[in-house]
């Protein structure tokens, strides 16, 4: 029986091995320890850099580190709000990027406003 983290790794490996032009990833790093999460984010961003990826995550820093565009889906019925962050450098962004903490703070405030 595989642990949650091992199941995540197997699922992620399958996605990375398939040659699909569009990839949907729903919380792909959620059951991983911090170091493995960071390493797999790096690997995933590099291996999928020429594909369209829709990443669903509840982690604002992960979204900002890996995304080209950020959108929030909320409400019932659901509405999508596109955020205008200037994500100029390519993912995966390094954690000491001076803009990441500022953007993370702004994104967290926006998420709180939506509750």
Residue ranges and their predicted role:
Residues 1-2, 6:
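Conserved ABC ATPase signature
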Residues 12:
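Hydrophobic anchor residue at the start of the ABC signature
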Residues 18:
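Conserved signature/switch motifs of ABC ATPase nucleotide-binding domains
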Residues 23-27:
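Catalytic Walker B motif of ABC-type/P-loop ATPase nucleotide-binding domains
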Residues 65-72:
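Conserved catalytic segment of ABC-fold P-loop ATPases
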């Amino acid at each position: 029986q595989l642990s949650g983290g091992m199941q995540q790794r197997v699922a992620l490996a399958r996605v990375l091995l398939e040659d699909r032009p569009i990839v949907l990833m729903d919380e792909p790093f959620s059951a991983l320890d911090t170091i493995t999460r960071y390493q797999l984010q790096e690997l995933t961003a590099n291996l999928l850099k020429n594909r369209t990826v829709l990443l669903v995550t509840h982690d604002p820093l992960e979204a900002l580190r890996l995304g080209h565009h950020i959108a929030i889906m909320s409400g019932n019925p659901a509405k999508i709000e596109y955020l205008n962050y200037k994500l100029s450098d390519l993912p995966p962004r390094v954690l000491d990027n001076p803009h990441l903490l500022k953007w993370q703070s702004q994104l967290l405030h926006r998420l709180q406003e939506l509750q």
